[in-house]
Amino acid sequence: MSEDINKIQANMHAPFGPMLMEFKMPQPYIDMLNTYGDKISASDKKSKQLDWSDNLVGNVKQEHKIEDHIWHEKPNENLPSLFNWMGACINLYVKTKLKQGDEQDNAVAEKGIKKVALHNSWLVNSIAGDFNPPHMHYGQLSAAGWLKMPESVAKDKERERAGWIEFLYGNPAMW
């Protein structure tokens, strides 16, 4: 998987257990996903076809599965596909995490990852009153992103309370 670490803007956070890495998504990918999401929301037929809410835990009115072809699209000629950009971010995360380990982990980190398997992806269009309760995501890595923020959240008094995400860590008890 190709990777240009110099073009990926990332910050590491380690508040507890697993390392969190915050990435800055380039604007062309944001624009591509927003255009895609807006087209789905504008079409009742497409919105129903891609409705993913039965597979998710939240109380959210618009949750749409991202079709596989979107991951392979490029926002322009100069950028890799969304999947390849995300793969480069994942590679950076894995290398950074492994380099915190022992000598054997460092050797593995230098090789990088060879394959990424994407299990599920969806867009959530949150509106006033929507919420997601605490829940688990299964798999090795999870990602979340914000593509649009209402002006009231970006500038007004709501800024300090709205649009938050909370990460919890632990193993599910099976009893």
Annotate the PLM regions:
Residues F16-P18, V116, Y138-Q140:
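A general secondary-structure signal for short beta-strands and their flanking turns/coil
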Residues S2-E110, G129-N132:
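Non-heme Fe(II)/2-oxoglutarate
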Residues K97-A117, H137, V153-R159:
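Short acidic alpha-helical/loop segments enriched in Asp/Glu that coordinate divalent cations
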Residues H119-W175:
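Catalytic core of non-heme Fe(II) oxygenases with the double-stranded beta-helix
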